[in-house]
Amino acid sequence: MKSIVFVALFGLALLAVVCSASEDAHKELLKEVVRAMVVDKTDAVQAGERECRWYLGGCSQDGDCCKHLQCHSNYEWCIWDGTFSK
């Protein structure tokens, strides 16, 4: 009788340890998914910013340059167009 109770308690303890480890693994997986979502969002923002050329970046027309920049006709790089805004 005592051995059956001991085996049952040991089984319950083992089950609790396995469930706890599974829960920790689930939390780590959730953290990785959230981290991946944040990184993907950051990459998407950077990709949108990369669609234009920055100051002194090479260009062939004004549309290649970022906001407040224009393409210099002789040197073909983006320079400030002289405008201000917020």
Swiss-Prot record:
One of its GO terms (molecular function) is ion channel inhibitor activity. It comes from the Eukaryota. Residues 22-50 form a propeptide. Belongs to the neurotoxin 10 (Hwtx-1) family. 17 (Hntx-9) subfamily. This is Omega-theraphotoxin-Hhn1f 4. Keywords: Disulfide bond, Ion channel impairing toxin, Knottin, Secreted, Signal, Toxin. Residues 1-21 form the signal peptide. Ion channel inhibitor. Disulfide bonds join C52-C66, C59-C71, C65-C78. It is found in: Secreted. It comes from Cyriopagopus hainanus. The presence of a 'disulfide through disulfide knot' structurally defines this protein as a knottin. InterPro entries: Huwentoxin-1 (IPR011696), Huwentoxin_CS1 (IPR013140). GO terms for cellular component: extracellular region. Expressed by the venom gland. SUPFAM superfamilies: omega toxin-like. Pfam families: Toxin_12 (PF07740).
